[in-house]
Amino acid sequence: WGGVVEDNSFGTHEFMRFCELVGCEPYISGNVGSGTVEELSNWVEYMTFDGVSPMAELRKRNGREQPWKLKYLGIGNESWGCGGSMRPEYYSDLYRRYATYCRNYSGNQLFKVASGSNADDYNWTEVLMKQITPWNMNGMSLHYYTVPNGDWWHKGSATKFDEEEYYKTIRSTLGIEGMIIRHSGIMDRYDPEHKVGLIVDEWGTWYDVEPGTNPGFLYQQNTMRDAIVAAINLNIFNQHSARIPMANIAQAVNVLQSILLTEGSKTIKTPTYHVFDLYKQHQDSDLIYSHIQNSNAAEGVPSLSQSASVNADGDVFVTLSNASLSESFKVDIAAAFAGIKSAEGRVLTDDVHALNTFEEPDRVTIKTLAVTVSDGRAEIILLSLIHISEPTRLQLIS
């Protein structure tokens, strides 16, 4: 990438240590395009085997005595394109071969993810579900990027856009829900018990790179437009969480729709970072059915999106976003099965072009939102991106 030397200074040990430091599950992608079965099998053994073998001994010599716990393992990546330009029939056979030799060592249980469809390639999903037995595949990936104009050669600027291009971006990102529904429908025919997850492990905005940067590094800035895109996508993923157990934005740092940007020793949080901060309480909670009265901000662009969940303590979390550039909404929130006794809210809102820079790192940040609770209902003014939480256990009002 970018025509520069890769010195491999950030390898397996450094990546796994990073995951430990930030408290996340590692997700390793195996090379099926140009790598061998033996190479991937050895890598899994190197990382997870707690015994005597050449790979385990090599890991110990490299400074790691105990094996890591590795759950998520991708068997190839974008095998339809840059990962090998394969047909789904051919990849299905390769997957079965490679996956056979990726074994569960020392109590470690792999969650094996097949290289799934590019956007709306439904035939790819059909073939994989038909030819790869569910017991040998825990997940299937889906990749979809939000490109404002649908033109990969002229994607547009991350920061300089007009109202028309803004709404094209939102319309493009909304397209992912139809794809999720159709891919899920195919999967339902072969896997009605939802044993195979749809893993949306590459999503987000993709613009032209920032002027003066290496085109191969895919470095782009991040505005409130990206925050709205992130919120819409996360709401969609929540709504379809029965089939989607995991979704991963691309990427985390300095590439595409990043949550962090760095410059030397400096780090800034992008508007997208703050969206993830607002939405994180949905994780490990249970989806609640929700419905919202809506209007269109532009043709094919609903103004509002939402999702709701409840955690083990009975706390309810509601996330809302407003894609309209011209209209605010007074939103009345009610629970059909209970009354709201107290609520608190946070909001991320600013001009649609607003962004954080190294000179002004906190231009876009989360603020407290006024929430009025009355007669078991909560009311807020929805300017832009909103997070509402119900911090006390919901109780029925008689």
Map each language-model feature to its residues.
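N-terminal catalytic cores of secreted or lumenal carbohydrate-active enzymes
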Residues: 1-162, 181
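Aromatic-lined carbohydrate-recognition surfaces of secreted/lumenal glycan-active proteins
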Residues: 31, 59-60, 101-122, 176-205, ...
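Glycoside hydrolase catalytic-domain groove-lining segments
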Residues: 147-214
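Aromatic/acidic polysaccharide-binding cleft in carbohydrate-active enzymes
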Residues: 195-306
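Short, well-ordered beta-strand segments enriched in hydrophobic/aromatic residues
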Residues: 314-322
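Surface-exposed beta-strand/loop patches in extracellular or lumenal glycoproteins
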Residues: 325-338
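Acidic, Ser/Thr/Pro-rich beta/coil linker or hinge segments at domain junctions
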Residues: 339-382
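Conserved small/polar residues in nucleotide/adenosyl-binding loops
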Residues: 386-392
